[in-house]
Amino acid sequence: MIERGKFRSLTLINWNGFFARTFDLDELVTTLSGGNGAGKSTTMAAFVTALIPDLTLLHFRNTTEAGATSGSRDKGLHGKLKAGVCYSMLDTINSRHQRVVVGVRLQQVAGRDRKVDIKPFAIQGLPMSVQPTQLVTETLNERQARVLSLAELKDKLDEMEGVQFKQFNSITDYHSLMFDLGIIARRLRSASDRSKFYRLIEASLYGGISSAITRSLRDYLLPENSGVRKAFQDMEAALRENRLTLEAIRVTQSDRDLFKHLISEATDYVAADYMRHANERRVHLDQALAFRRELYTSRKQLAAEQYKHVDMARELGEHNGAEGSLEADYQAASDHLNLVQTALRQQEKIERYEADLEELQIRLEEQNEVVAEAAEMQDENEARAEAAELEVDELKSQLADYQQALDVQQTRAIQYNQAISALARAKELCHLPDLTPESAAEWLDTFQAKEQEATEKLLSLEQKMSVAQTAHSQFEQAYQLVAAINGPLARSEAWDVARELLRDGVNQRHLAEQVQPLRMRLSELEQRLREQQEAERLLAEFCKRQGKNFDIDELEALHQELEARIASLSESVSSASEQRMALRQEQEQLQSRIQHLMQRAPVWLAAQNSLNQLSEQCGEEFTSSQEVTEYLQQLLEREREAIVERDEVGARKNAVDEEIERLSQPGGAEDQRLNALAERFGGVLLSEIYDDVSLEDAPYFSALYGPSRHAIVVPDLSQIAEQLEGLTDCPEDLYLIEGDPQSFDDSVFSVDELEKAVVVKIADRQWRYSRFPSLPIFGRAARENRIESLHAEREVLSERFATLSFDVQKTQRLHQAFSRFIGSHLSVAFEDDPEAEIRRLNGRRVELERALATHESDNQQQRLQFEQAKEGVSALNRLLPRLNLLADETLADRVDEIQERLDEAQEAARFVQQYGNQLAKLEPVVSVLQSDPEQFEQLKEDYAWSQQMQRDARQQAFALAEVVERRAHFSYSDSAEMLSGNSDLNEKLRQRLEQAEAERTRAREALRSHAAQLSQYSQVLASLKSSYDTKKELLNDLQRELQDIGVRADSGAEERARQRRDELHAQLSNNRSRRNQLEKALTFCEAEMENLTRKLRKLERDYHEMREQVVTAKAGWCAVMRMVKDNGVERRLHRRELAYLSADELRSMSDKALGALRLAVADNEHLRDVLRLSEDPKRPERKIQFFVAVYQHLRERIRQDIIRTDDPVEAIEQMEIELSRLTEELTSREQKLAISSRSVANIIRKTIQREQNRIRMLNQGLQSVSFGQVNSVRLNVNVRETHATLLDVLSEQQEQHQDLFNSNRLTFSEALAKLYQRLNPQIDMGQRTPQTIGEELLDYRNYLEMEVEVNRGSDGWLRAESGALSTGEAIGTGMSILVMVVQSWEDEARRLRGKDISPCRLLFLDEAARLDARSIATLFELCERLQMQLIIAAPENISPEKGTTYKLVRKVFQNTEHVHVVGLRGFAPQLPETLPGTQTEDTPSEAS
């Protein structure tokens, strides 16, 4: 008998109160006894933590804070640990006598969350002598030890031979090892399984009936029938796949035309665009090359035009420069002509003004004399009038003063003052400071004499002035003439300068007479010089055009050479046109031939495509039409052979299908009617009873029962005798065996076993010899083995049948393809390749184009040479007549010499013209210049001084006369004498005043009349002077202008100037004409250059754009080609016949296909989006993506399980071959896969019966369990009424609901859910889907209701609830349920684990003091009978008689808390003894 595994010990390291404590566990019950806070719950928590190290589940509630929720940070574990490394280890021994230590390393994590870090580990192969505490501690001295870390523990165990240490990163791996080694009873695969296990432990720990377990007893007690559910799921998956395949076939059948249309239009749409881009790429390349050639040609033309432009610009610049000089010369000549004409007019004016001036000079001299006489008389009158005026004023003043003195008392004083004033004035004027009134009279006589003397002297000077004035005017006139001719000079030099001027005037007149002959000679020489310069210019221009310098002697020979060259070039140009015409004619012929071949090429390419497809399909190469017809005959023979083989394979496949169907019957019944009969008789098929027989025993039992292996085992044969009457729906031989189906054995026969055979003694006189079948089918294992081999054979046959069917269809389609090829393309398929001929002709055409370009270039060069030669001859024709001028080298010197002589003669002519009249006037009066009458000026000064002296003497005499007259005022007599005297004086004054006023009036009248006459004379003189000065100034201006003009006007000057101007005008006109020609040519050249530049820019832009487009297109084309090659669609898209269509035709073809595709993919969102994206003309790769997407879509639609190819085009060809065969095959497969509703009901019923029997066996183990008033505990299992109705309908009334189970739209699970809803409309299904409900209905556990019942006192059997039981009864009942769950788990796990392992059984019970002694004893008895270990925690009043008891007391020693532990074993019959391996006191030690 297999021994059950046991937990040997529990070790706590560095827990709160336990530094290093090992609890040896009893084989039955281990009791932890102690008061509150002794450490019982800590010890159990350490055990649970080592058993289930899942922090999401661990929750030690009795040590957490009050009112704690599931969200508390501390789950009760953090406070049970000490700081540092902690361990909790379980030492176990399993059924194989293997010692296994499992445990966890715990460590508090710093922080306010009070977290704990847990690491599970396991140790195998540890010797029995090594204690767990020795592994994880290191002794430092007698009273100190140190806890090892997990890494140190690993290193320590690695040094021990044969010991294995495993550390786990997941709890699942940890529990998997514990399950495999028999430490726990159930494999905990998931967190849900761990949660069930923890709830089980928690329920046992805290006691009572756990509602969490009783509510879900089905999950704890009933094993999940995963095999059945997996079978249903596989069946449904197979059916779903089968139906999807059938649906795909139907869709494919319905969409076959759509596929063809989609592929055809997609191919047209993409291939047309693909070939259009290929053509455009080739066209763009050709255009880019053409642009580049044209660009190079244009650059050459532009360079030539630029050279030509430079030459013409240089020549134009020369002409412009020459024109500037000619214009300047012409303008100078015109100006010179104008100056000559102006000088002539000026000369006429000068002569006229000079005559006028001579006349005005005479009149002016006469008028001067008249004015001078009048002025003298006027002076005398003014002096006389002034003296009269003064005398009148004086007298009036005296009379006024005197009158005033008479009227006023101060008259005398006033008169006295006036006398004093007159005396002072007289002193000042006469310069007599000693003058007195008495001496005034004497001095008056003196000064009157001086006045008389001055007057006489003035009259004598006037006479002298009139005599000297005449001589002075003649000298001044001659001096002015000399100064006018020579310029300013000293008066003493006038005589010498005048004689020199008269001599020089004679010489100048002689030179002036030579001007006209010299001018004529100079004009002739200048004309020849200009002709010589023109000839030199023509020669230089000719040399520049020829690019070489020529001597004068070489020009005639060069002229003959150029004429000969012109003749030869003319012949070459005329012959070049004929050669060009021949080349163009050949080019047109080639073009016509290429066009013809391009029209024939598509037909040939279509034939080649068809031929290539035939070659690919048949794997043969055809070189002639005869080979094609011969291969067609071979195809017919091959088709007949394939049809015969296909029919044979189909017959064998049908036989295998029938055998598989027969072996696949539920329960092993080969006849479906046997299941109905077994259910009708209330029996079980014999094959179903032996359904679990192994594959090794199957041949024996198959031979043992022989034909009766399909018998029905019934409990009582007598009860079915009546049912056999009238039984017709049954096999020919129906075997019935009496026996209990639950405990049936093979003792019904007497059997002798032989070698690979048996002898069955049916009766005394009837034996049956049966050999072991080579292929047994008795038992599920044998049937499954046989079905598996048949399935393999069927797969081979199906594959072979499909291959043969496909080959037949392929051969038939190949035959049709050959027939179409022969009818359409055989006549042209084997002709020569037109594309090769096109390539050859294109090469020749390129050569012709190159030859034409070379010919055009040569012809252009010859034309240019011809034009240059003609221009050279024309230039030489102008040069040759002027060779003598070119040879005359002294012409310029002679011109310069004559020019100098002419300049001298012209200067002399200008001198004579300017000063001739002055010299003529000077010659008669030159003699007066010998003596200078300078005394005339002195005489004038003396005369002026005499006049002043006379005026001063007159004033002095008048002042003295006044003093003399006022002598009386200096002394006064008495008043009477003064009045009398004043009266006489007044009278005298009045008389004098009247005389003075009369004199003044006469003087004024004389002055006025003479002043009017003087004014008239002065006006006439001023008028004459003004006229003379004006004409003199005008004459001077005219002479200055004539000098400024610098031209000597003579009779021939105007004619010469006009002739010179006309010559320069002719030259200027010729120069301008040539310049205009050059400007026009230059403008034309610039326009040509600009056109060429624009053309060049356009060509460069077009070339760069085209090149960029080519490069971009190349990148895009490379991407397209890569995509095409990667997806293997080049053969579909590169349709060479489309290369001969125009871009418009291809675009039209693509657009038509696009319109058709839009309709075709309107219902497909993905293809519609891809098609919309592919319409972008700038992204051609998107059309390839669309084509690939279409292929991918078709691949997905066609499915590889139907048609084995990746090419949708080939798939469409294969589609018609496969569709009918697959439809038939899949329909039959669905019928075979579909399970009947009755079979499902039978499977569920049998599973329920089996589990009910198992629960019944579990109840037998709980019948003797009693707690207080509870006499017994049991599990009650019932089938739910709604689910029982469902099973009855599935078994008996399935025909009424075939609309659900025969629907192709519903799976079996969904149909089952729909039926459940139909039968139970009152049940609310919530949000669950029919598939989910159906899967639940396929689980037998959902058909059962389970509840725990107790037999309590007089109440009998009632439902176990905590409210109806006492605390002890509830604890005992709950423990019984937990034991049942553990046993159920062991039974379920026995299939998963080795047969030689019986797992450990251990439960907990905290606060066991709530149980009485009888209940405790019952627990001990239960543990003993079930070989279960139990750990109980109780106060000190619990003293079990059996098991092991540990008394725990928590103490504090030197501020250190520790738990004192004493262990006792079975103390009732014998004295207590200390358990080995325990200490009387757990001495704490300090960690180093």
Swiss-Prot record:
Q: Does the keyword Phosphoprotein apply?
A: no
Q: What is its main location?
A: cytoplasm
Give any Gene Ontology cellular component.
nucleoid
Q: Does the keyword Coiled coil apply?
A: yes
Q: Name one GO biological process term.
A: DNA replication
**Gene Ontology terms for molecular function:** ATP binding; DNA binding
Q: Where is this region: Disordered?
A: 1049-1074
Tell me, what does this protein do in biology?
Plays a central role in chromosome condensation, segregation and cell cycle progression. Functions as a homodimer, which is essential for chromosome partition. Involved in negative DNA supercoiling in vivo, and by this means organize and compact chromosomes. May achieve or facilitate chromosome segregation by condensation DNA from both sides of a centrally located replisome during cell division.
Instruction: Tell what the record comments on domains.
Output: The hinge domain, which separates the large intramolecular coiled coil regions, allows the homodimerization, forming a V-shaped homodimer.
Q: So what family is this one in?
A: Belongs to the SMC family. MukB subfamily.
The name under which this protein is listed is Chromosome partition protein MukB
